[in-house]
A protein has these predicted regions:
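Hydrophobic/aromatic-lined pockets within catalytic cores
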Residues: 8, 12, 23-27, 59-67, ...
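Class II aminoacyl-tRNA synthetase-like tRNA-binding/catalytic domains
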Residues: 1-44
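Flexible loop/turn segments at secondary-structure boundaries
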Residues: 3-5, 23-28, 47, 137-141, ...
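Active-site lining segments that contact anionic ligands and/or coordinate catalytic metals
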Residues: 13-15, 36-38, 126-128, 153-155, ...
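A generic structural motif
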Residues: 40-51, 162-164
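A residue-level signal for conserved active-site and pocket-lining positions in enzyme catalytic cores
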Residues: 11, 41, 96, 131, ...
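Metal-assisted phosphate- and nucleotidyl-transfer catalytic regions
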Residues: 57-161, 184-203
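Active-site pocket scaffolds in enzymes
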Residues: 169-170, 174-241
């Protein structure tokens, strides 16, 4: 859906989607599935900071509504929700590495943050927080590099506790840059030609994000396993029912 919703921004300035995602996911953990629901937006003439504000407003609105209208259900789950304060804290990838080094984590620049590191950050920040400015090689080909430092991207992840809830950023809207990034990631641009064709006619600058619905439910309900908040979970070991 990612590539299709980007195309749609050339016609509709604001694109919203709630849909099933299917992924060849190799990870077999308590927070990964091969089929899941994603909540997505894509906005024309927007940057990462703009859609980050939309994301935090959505999270706060949902938490507030659940807290006010689902008191008995939350009590049954033994869950007390606190409405997060806006704006959410923002730290860069570099700042995250520095914080983790102070807690004896040794992560080289350009490496992804492993689960133990995310758990430690979740202990330090007790509310949702953004990690921004991720290295270029850690993000998909359609994420825009920063003009002042192309090794870094205009990207963000939204974390809460130890979970990554959402990921997004400013998108590349020029075909030549997309082709360059595809080749950089050892992908064949010819296989993406139906997508790239639309960029020949002019694509507006755009930004967006996708949020894993079940992971958000995990945070709301306090469950530790994504299968507890999913009807008929499907992972690498289970497809039926």
């Amino acid at each position: 859906p990612q590539l299709y919703k980007e195309i749609l921004t050339s016609v509709f300035e604001k694109v919203f989607e709630i849909a099933q995602f299917y992924r060849a996911e190799e990870s077999d953990t308590t927070y990964h599935l091969n089929e899941f629901i994603s909540v997505d937006i894509e906005v024309a003439f927007a940057e990462a900071k703009d859609v980050m504000e939309v994301l935090e407003q959505l999270v706060v609105h949902v938490i507030r509504e659940v807290k006010e209208k689902c008191e008995s259900e939350l009590k049954l789950l033994g869950r007390e929700l606190e409405v997060p304060k806006m704006p959410f804290k923002r730290i860069t990838y570099d700042e995250a590495l520095e914080i983790l080094r102070e807690h004896n984590f040794r992560i080289e620049w350009g490496e992804d943050l492993p689960t133990p590191a995310n758990r430690k950050l979740g202990e330090i920040f007790d509310e949702p927080y953004f990690i921004t400015d991720w290295p270029r090689k850690l993000k998909p080909f359609y994420i825009k590099p920063k003009e002042e430092n192309p090794k870094i991207t205009e990207s963000f992840d939204l974390n809460w506790s130890w979970l990554e809830l959402a990921s997004g950023g400013t998108r590349i809207h020029r075909k030549d840059m997309l082709v360059e990034r595809l080749r950089e990631q050892n992908l064949n641009p010819e296989k993406f030609e139906p997508f790239l064709t639309y960029f020949e006619y002019g694509m507006p600058p755009h930004a967006g994000w996708g949020m894993g619905f079940q992971r958000f439910l995990m945070v709301i309900t306090g469950r530790r396993n994504i299968r507890e908040v999913t009807l008929f979970p499907r992972d690498k070991n289970r497809l039926v029912p």
